[in-house]
Structure formats: structure tokens, C-alpha cells
């Protein structure tokens, strides 16, 4: 398995080629099984069947993560499954499977999308009446887990730069206020994000989500995997932040989109580098 490469194929086939203890961070947003019309995936499995499938790939996530590896999974708090009588606490059931395969709980991030971007439909319940309203939490979260050690065993280069200054006769690391504010947001587990106004796939991953997870949970040059890569947002975020990336995607169409995004970014970097060299000359 090579790093900085995007693989087109079934998730379990791709995991079978991935070594044990190889990945530093898995950050992904899997199908929610809510009937989305994906090009190469049936998003209408039975509830129990869905979580049996989840268990198979979570076992592979656990196997391929390093002992101090982390996992960050973007899912909804609740979903609607008529076979279970309506709303179900999806996050709780998902975490139960994570725990079953061996993951330790590392926290849960509340994703804060501007209210103006949320659906205001009430077709799922009564309107202006106590008859049968459905109290519906449309927000999503990021479930966090770690494999064996919650502390990184091998230190690396941090995301945030600092100046070394002497304060009261002692050397102290001084960070910018902007970086400190960002760190506070990440550790207090309420991440602001904006969905792409021009989605490239059926369910495009907001770049805000993987970039925040990568910043807070990895060092530079760490290996980041997205096993449901979609349009390549996690890989692109990792590349921009100086990490190595791996992506799995079953859809040939989405795989091509993700490769083009990486190629376009590389082209832009080369152009900017040449422009800088020209003006510095």
C-alpha cells in the first residue's frame, strides 16, 4: 500500500492490501443508510444488516491503525428507520459497534452548521399542532476513538508554529492569538463548518471537517486514511496540511473526480511557486 495515492475499489478489498499498524488517523464519513442515491452503493440496507457491514470495516480500521492511532467518523445523531418505528439514536448504535471491535472512546464533536443552511421541512410530522410533531435533530457529529494509547507515542512537527521568547527569565513558546483561538475551538468539541455550495458528488464532505481533525489529531508527515473518499476532500486537506494521504473509493466516477482535484491543486502550487520565483528574481 503506497501513501499519497487514491485507490478505486471496494473498501474491504482495499483494506486487505493495507498493512497492520500503518495508519495514524482515519477520518471519514460513511454512508448513513438513509436512501441516498449513490452511484455504486445500496443505501437502503436493513438496520441490522447495515451495522453488520459497519462492523466488518471497523475491524479493518482497528487493525490498520497504529497503536496510538485515532479515528474520526462523521455521522448524524439520529436517522429515520421505519422498520424500527421511526427515529433511532444512530450515534449510540454506531459507537456500540466501535466499542465492540476494540476502540476506546476519545470524545464526540458537535458539528455546528449555520442554521440558514438547514432544511425547514416538517413533512415528517404535524404542523403547528401537538397531534404528532417529530422532534428532529438534523445536526451531525464526529465520533472519536483511539486504538490503544490516547497519547501519541512518537512526537512530530505540530500544526501550529510559535516563537521562542524569554519571559521572566524562562524560555516560553508564544503562539499567535489566531492559532490559540483555533486550538480552543478544536478541543472544546464544537466545530463550525460550511457545506460546499457546489457539491462534486451526491454527499460531498465539507473540507472544514477533515482539516480540523487532521490538525488536532496528527503531526506533519503522519498518514491519514479516508476509506470512503468520495470526491477526495480528506486527501486534499491532508496534502494541504503536509500529511500523507490514502483514499479508498468504490465509485470510478468519484475516484476520477478526486484524482482531478489533487492534480488541480498540484498544478496551482507549481504555478504559485513559479510566480514567486519570478517576482523574487
Predicted regions and their residues:
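Short, flexible loop/turn segments with low-complexity composition
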Residues: 155-161, 269-279
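Conserved SAM/SAH-binding loop
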Residues: 8-13, 275-281
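Short, conserved SAM-binding/catalytic segment
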Residues: 1, 259-272
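Core catalytic lobe of class I
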Residues: 1-257
